[in-house]
Amino acid sequence: MAGVNDAIRDSVLFTTADSIISWSRRSALWPETFGIACCAIEMISAGCARYDLDRFGVVFRPSPRQSDVMIIAGTVTRKFAPVVRRLYDQMPEPRWVIAMGTCAISGGVYNTYAVVQGSETFVPVDVHVPGCPPRPEALMHGFLLLQEKIKKSRALTGTPLGRVIAS
């Protein structure tokens, strides 16, 4: 009888629905492909063969309705902020935001009336990737931190976690 119990133990997986849902969400992150400033060049580099974000399950999508991650890569002006918010609202739930670069995080060197001083004023930001511009490795690290955040969140209860800063 011990052989039957060993066979069952080796073929049955015990887990929770939360862990299955968070595994599927973090394994297939689809960021939206739009860039605002020079950080977008580094974002494009991160998707190329040298860095290959596809191996982490990150596949860039052309439409907000097909994506679940928004990368705000660059300076956001007050005139452009409602457009970014509309794109965010068009994304299906659950959705996450990565603020990439100093300009997206705090307005950067542009301390003027026309530039939004931080993306958190119009969308909730989950991960901050600092730098001017941040290297593709920093964006990769930001995606790994986002995956860890998704792993720790409760999918069924919708418990959100705080923001994460990539170093």
Curated annotation (Swiss-Prot):
Its EC number is 7.1.1.-. The keyword Translocase applies. Pfam families: Oxidored_q6 (PF01058). Its cofactor is [4Fe-4S] cluster. Keywords: 4Fe-4S, Cell inner membrane, Cell membrane, Iron, Iron-sulfur, Membrane, Metal-binding, NAD, Plasmid, Quinone, Translocase, Transport, Ubiquinone. It catalyses: a quinone + NADH + 5 H(+)(in) = a quinol + NAD(+) + 4 H(+)(out). InterPro entries: NADH_UbQ_OxRdtase-like_20kDa (IPR006137), NADH_UQ_OxRdtase_20Kd_su (IPR006138). GO terms for biological process: aerobic respiration; electron transport coupled proton transport. Its main location: membrane. Binds 1 [4Fe-4S] cluster. PANTHER family: NADH DEHYDROGENASE (PTHR11995), NADH DEHYDROGENASE [UBIQUINONE] IRON-SULFUR PROTEIN 7, MITOCHONDRIAL (PTHR11995:SF14). NDH-1 shuttles electrons from NADH, via FMN and iron-sulfur (Fe-S) centers, to quinones in the respiratory chain. The immediate electron acceptor for the enzyme in this species is believed to be ubiquinone. Couples the redox reaction to proton translocation (for every two electrons transferred, four hydrogen ions are translocated across the cytoplasmic membrane), and thus conserves the redox energy in a proton gradient. This is NADH-quinone oxidoreductase subunit B 2. It comes from Rhizobium meliloti (strain 1021) (Ensifer meliloti).
